[in-house]
Regions:
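Catalytic core of non-heme Fe(II) oxygenases with the double-stranded beta-helix
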Residues: 93, 97, 101-216
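Non-heme Fe(II)/2-oxoglutarate
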Residues: 5-7, 11-116
């Protein structure tokens, strides 16, 4: 089994630029090709990780969890770390969390200036093309409770459609203005200030698979 090891010399190659307020960083080939393939083959292939097959779970709504005004677009989901509330330590829910530690060390170094990984929440989503009645984007949201300072490390497992859309707004709004759109590409990571509202387009042509962690 391939194992990614993050060394100091490898981190030196990553320009250290701590995330500024409301900043968005998009970096291609953030991890080695071998590591990219390991993640892809584990999540959407047939590879085992430490002898275990990756499990997916059904959710009825990919962003809003069944809110009445949401698009109710189903997906598959896997939770690595559960954020309960600000007063309790996040809980590691999955043995597959270890697969992403090297990725998160790089993300933490790039976004926070430290290799120490303080993961507050971690999830993956797997979306399939749908026959849509409308093409509205999924509900804009933030990943954690409002006011909880964190960065988002969003990794794309494979090439697909279904852009990530990051807005200028930091609170719910009747009208959103687009700050940046990012197209899913294998090996690409998006690191941004977690206060920014964001969402994703529903894929129409390809399977969309992401790894989403919130670091503090």
């Amino acid at each position: 089994m391939f194992t990614e090891i993050v060394t100091l010399s490898a981190l030196v190659k990553i320009t250290l630029t701590m995330i500024k307020e409301h900043e968005v960083l998009v970096i291609d080939d953030f991890i080695s090709t071998e590591y990219q393939e390991q993640i892809k083959n584990t999540l959407i292939g047939e590879a085992l990780f430490n002898g275990h097959e990756f499990p997916w779970h059904y959710i009825e709504d990919v962003t809003a969890c069944g809110d009445h005004d949401s698009q109710h677009r189903p997906a598959l989901y896997h939770q690595y770390i559960d954020f309960i509330n600000e007063d309790q330590k996040p809980v590691v829910d999955s043995k597959f969390h270890d697969l992403f530690v090297p990725l998160l060390q790089r993300g933490s170094f790039k976004g926070l200036g430290t290799t120490k990984v303080n993961a507050l929440q971690g999830r993956s989503f797997l979306q399939f093309p749908l026959n849509l009645k409308n093409y509205d984007v999924d509900n804009p949201h933030i990943d954690l409770v409002e006011g909880h300072k964190h960065i988002v490390v969003l990794y794309y497992v494979c090439d697909s459609d279904g852009d990530t859309i990051i807005y200028n707004e930091t609170k719910e709004s009747d009208q959103y203005t687009v700050k940046q759109r990012v197209t899913p590409k294998q090996g690409r990571v998006v690191i941004f200030d977690g206060v920014l509202m964001h969402t994703a387009e529903q894929p129409l042509n390809n399977t969309r698979c992401i790894v989403n962690y919130n670091l503090g």
